[in-house]
Amino acid sequence: MKTFTATPETVTRDWFVVDADGKTLGRIATEIATRLRGKHKPEYTPHVDTGDYIIVINAEKVTVTGNKAKGKTYYSHSGFPGGIKQISFEKLQAHKPEMIIEKAVKGMLPKGPLGRAMFRKLKVYAGAEHNHAAQQPQVLDI
């Protein structure tokens, strides 16, 4: 019996919606990253994007444990000397809550073209509304 290898033409992708309300950031991010890679499917192939589309709603209500809300810091750099910027979890959650989940999931995906293709299948929204109703997403409990 030959080993099955998925090809981009044979991959079927589903749409799932995840409610992040009251969920812990790391717990939800690991499950999302697994689904984006397609590791939950029996036809998973490491060099082929076999993952599903994931819609995350209520990103503004995601939680972290302990004192990380005050202590967790996100860094970015402009590329110029002295251009490093930092922002705390609390401020980023108030300013751009989608970015918190995006950064957590992106760090768990492969680096390179395949990882970027997987990341493009993640759609994050701060509130409870999303504009992907036409795709008929299934609710995914995490």
UniProtKB/Swiss-Prot annotation:
CDD domains in UniProt: Ribosomal_L13
Family per similarity comment: Belongs to the universal ribosomal protein uL13 family.
Species for this entry: Shewanella sp. (strain W3-18-1)
Protein known as: Large ribosomal subunit protein uL13
Record's GO cellular component terms: cytosolic large ribosomal subunit
InterPro entries named among the record's database cross-references: Ribosomal_uL13 (IPR005822), Ribosomal_uL13_bac-type (IPR005823), Ribosomal_uL13_CS (IPR023563), Ribosomal_uL13_sf (IPR036899)
Ranges in coiled-coil conformation: none
BP GO terms, sorted: negative regulation of translation; translation
UniProt xrefs under Gene3D superfamilies: Ribosomal protein L13
One Gene Ontology molecular-function label: mRNA binding
Protein purpose: This protein is one of the early assembly proteins of the 50S ribosomal subunit, although it is not seen to bind rRNA by itself. It is important during the early stages of 50S assembly.
Gene: rplM
Keywords: Ribonucleoprotein, Ribosomal protein
Pfam families, A to Z: Ribosomal_L13
Subunit structure and binding partners: Part of the 50S ribosomal subunit.
